[in-house]
Amino acid sequence: MLSHRLGASARRMPHLDAGTDAGQNAPPMSAPPTPPPPLIDVCALSFARRDEPVFGPLSFTLAAGQIVLIEGDNGSGKTTLLRVLAGLLQPDSGSACILGAAPGSEAARAQMATLGHLLGLKGDLTVLENLRLGMALYGCRAGADVRAVLDQVGLDGYADEPVRTLSAGQKKRTALARLALLPARLWLLDEPYANLDRAGIGVVNALLDAHAAAGGGALVSSHGAVGFHQGVASTLRLQA
């Protein structure tokens, strides 16, 4: 009886020999996913005006979730660099890619929003009408709440005010609200702290932090970096 029980146990054991490898039947391991391209990839980029160098050569990258500061005196090329990356000017040498596409291409423009000295607001339209116009032209970030964004930038109660009646700082806040509503992953901001008080500077920093936390990125120029917070990933210092 004892030998019978041992035999029964042996029959239940799996049969292994030297020619069997459990890994042989496992599915092949897939290659790791290709990382997405950086939001900005610049290599030896330079620009000159009338044969006089404006900036460069510059090389840098900006990844999702990063904020990069461009710092420099007036005339150092901060605005020119942003215009080159937006596809409004052609560089003299080097290369730049915006999410893997050429600056100014349809693919790049679809993923990019800019804010400069000219805010592009319609003075005869109300604050709310300006925001709705921006969303109609350029789309809207998923889940965006216009009233919540107005409150975030300190314009709660100003939705029905014509933009022409606002102060310079309130107009800047309106443009910031429009920016926050857009679906663009990359922000190019030229002097966003101009015409803002301490509270307005805090609004800019809060919007930048939220945008970076959501996987976006921003390239920000600032004269003297006034008010710029500590979340900056790196700083480009341009010399006049």
Language-model features, listed with the residues they occupy:
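Hydrophobic anchor residue at the start of the ABC signature
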Residues: 176, 215
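Catalytic Walker B motif of ABC-type/P-loop ATPase nucleotide-binding domains
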Residues: 187-191
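Conserved ABC transporter NBD signature motif
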Residues: 94-110
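Conserved ABC ATPase signature
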Residues: 162-166
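Helix-to-loop junction immediately C-terminal to a conserved catalytic motif
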Residues: 86
